[in-house]
Each structure stands twice: as C-alpha cells, then as structure tokens.
Amino acid sequence: MITIITQDQLKTSPSVREDGRAFDELRPLKIEAGILERADGSSYLEFGGNKILVAVYGPREAQIRKLQRPDRAVIRCRYNMAPFSVEERKRPGPDRRSVEISKITAEALRPALILEKFPRSVIDVFIEVLEAEGGTRCAGITAASVALADAGIPMRDMVVACAAGKVGDQVVLDLSEEEDKEGQADVPVAILPRTREITLLQSDGNLTPEEFERALDLAVEGCLRIHEVQKEALRKRYGE
C-alpha cells in the first residue's frame, strides 16, 4: 500500500515539514577539509541548499600595530555572501548583516582557540557563502572551525553551530530558508561539543520558557550530530 502525503498534510502534520523532514531532522550535510592549496587551512560545506567555502590564513605577524596583542593572537573573520548566492542578486561588498555575522563568528570561535601561543599575531578567517538557503551563520561557524583545525591552529575543542526555531507553533531543528521566513522564532547556538559549553546563543522571535528550553536542547543535539561530520571530514583529510 502506497501512502500519498499531500501538501496540506505536510503543512499541518506535527511530525512532517514542508520539505519532508521530521521536526528533529537536519538537512543533508557534507563537509570537506583542505581543498584550497594556497590557504593555511580550508573547508567546503554543503548543508541543505547552502554552499560555503572557508579559507584560513595565519597565524602571521600583525602588521597593523593596533591589532597587536602582546599576550595573544587576534582572530578576524570576514563573512561574505557572494552576489549570486541568493535569488535577488545582492550588491557586492559587506553590508550591515555581514559585518554583524563576521563579529559574531569571531566571538563564537575565540573560546576554542589557544591564542596565547601566538602573541602579536593575527589569524584571518574568510567565509564565502556561494549559495544561501537559510542558516548560513551557523553553517559558516561550523565550516570555519574545520578550516581552523586544518590550518593546525591549536584548539581546546572544535566549535559547531546549529539553530532551532518555531514554525507553526512547533519547535523544529535546523530551519530552512522558507521556514525562517515564515517562522515565529529562531535560536542559533554554537557549542564546544566535548563540554557542551555555549559560545553563541541568540534568540529572535517569541517563545515561551518551555519552548526556548526545547529549542536549546534541540539545537545542542543538532550540534552534536554535525560534530560527527566535522570529525569525519578531518579524518578523511589526514587519514586517521
């Protein structure tokens, strides 16, 4: 017997979303490490319709004096959406959102890095969104962590990010672009998976305390699943 699920059922079922996923299901994910020869570290990530390339350069001596810290390195992140990454072609160059996400990304990654080993140095992380389909800030953080590990930067742990949110009064994991547009709330989270220390936590929208707790638990669980893909990418890269 073949069961046919209609579009109306997809929209109203608590366990099936418009793209066919369960409420606690991630989009398909692929990560590769070390794909750029001239970067010190690099990664490529596909997460649903997102395609993101990350290059890491450094640590290297900070040429600008105001960037120098006598006791540690400085991490700089540049998040950029390519003009062709979205349906409505965007203007080249950083906009307000890109600047904000660049800052948030650096803050999320910093706790994992042993920066005191490289005083007066800078580590540059370039995140290029080639195609965007919702959740690019979390995907960028996840890919950047792999690229930093590929660069050999000493790390206390990886950083992995994922979001949960509320769509149609249902708390769901890993919002797609359409769900993000139509949804009632979004909770991006980044953690150090070994200790589950939170390095990024944002909340946009309306959630009850119980819904927020559920969203946070779902996002952390999503992070732990994504971390397995991070580890596999590095194992393939280094044959371990």
UniProtKB/Swiss-Prot annotation:
One of its GO terms (molecular function) is RNA binding. The keyword Hydrolase applies. Its EC number is 3.1.13.-. One of its GO terms (biological process) is rRNA catabolic process. It is an enzyme of class 3 (hydrolase). Keywords: Cytoplasm, Exonuclease, Exosome, Hydrolase, Nuclease. GO terms for cellular component: cytoplasmic exosome (RNase complex). SUPFAM superfamilies: Ribonuclease PH domain 2-like, Ribosomal protein S5 domain 2-like. It is found in: Cytoplasm. InterPro entries: ExoRNase_PH_dom1, ExoRNase_PH_dom2, ExoRNase_PH_dom2_sf, PNPase/RNase_PH_dom_sf, Ribosomal_Su5_D2-typ_SF, RNase_PH, Rrp41. Pfam families: RNase_PH, RNase_PH_C. Belongs to the RNase PH family. Rrp41 subfamily. Catalytic component of the exosome, which is a complex involved in RNA degradation. Has 3'->5' exoribonuclease activity. Can also synthesize heteromeric RNA-tails. Component of the archaeal exosome complex. Forms a hexameric ring-like arrangement composed of 3 Rrp41-Rrp42 heterodimers. The hexameric ring associates with a trimer of Rrp4 and/or Csl4 subunits. NCBIfam families: ECX1 (TIGR02065). This is Exosome complex component Rrp41. It comes from Methanothermobacter thermautotrophicus (strain ATCC 29096 / DSM 1053 / JCM 10044 / NBRC 100330 / Delta H).
